[in-house]
A protein has these predicted regions:
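Small cysteine-rich, disulfide-bonded extracellular modules of the LU/uPAR three-finger superfamily
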Residues: 1-84, 91-141
Length: 141
């Protein structure tokens, strides 16, 4: 298990293909996935054995001081299962709007190690609590 950023996700921020200020970012519970920094799309995560079991609403994102943060949220899980990580991804086109197909949804980061991780959700609304310290969701530098 390992937390990590997806290399194409970081490249997406640098090239403007991912925009935390205008696009819709979501968090999803994923189980059965072994992190690969090379993955670019949600469809690659699920194609590598990751099973999505709950997706948050669009995150209320803030970008300041070299960090990306968001309000804590919930994701409704559809079945009880164990050992879920959190997948952060851009669900819309770069300009925002409706969700695009999983084959076009850009993955950004994956978290399965840390306080409260991996998550052991039951059925129903399961909280996602972001770091309130200096690291937030993503910290540059």
């Amino acid at each position: 298990m390992a937390n990590g950023y997806f290399t194409p996700g970081i490249e997406g921020f640098l090239t403007g293909e991912i925009d935390a200020n205008t696009a819709v970012l979501r968090a999803a519970f994923v189980r059965g996935y072994t992190f690969s920094a090379a993955h670019k799309f949600v469809s690659e995560v699920t194609g590598a054995g990751g099973v999505i079991n709950g997706v948050s609403a669009g995150l209320a994102v803030t970008v300041t001081g070299g960090t990306i943060d968001a309000a804590d949220t919930t994701a409704t899980t559809t079945a009880s299962a164990v050992d879920h990580g959190i997948l952060l991804y851009q669900s819309s086109a770069v300009g925002g709007g409706a969700d695009v197909a999983a084959s076009a949804q850009r993955v950004i980061a994956y978290y399965d190690t840390g306080t409260g991780l991996p998550i052991q959700p039951g059925s129903g609304a399961t909280p996602i609590t972001w770091d309130n310290g200096t690291n937030k969701i993503i910290k540059v530098g």
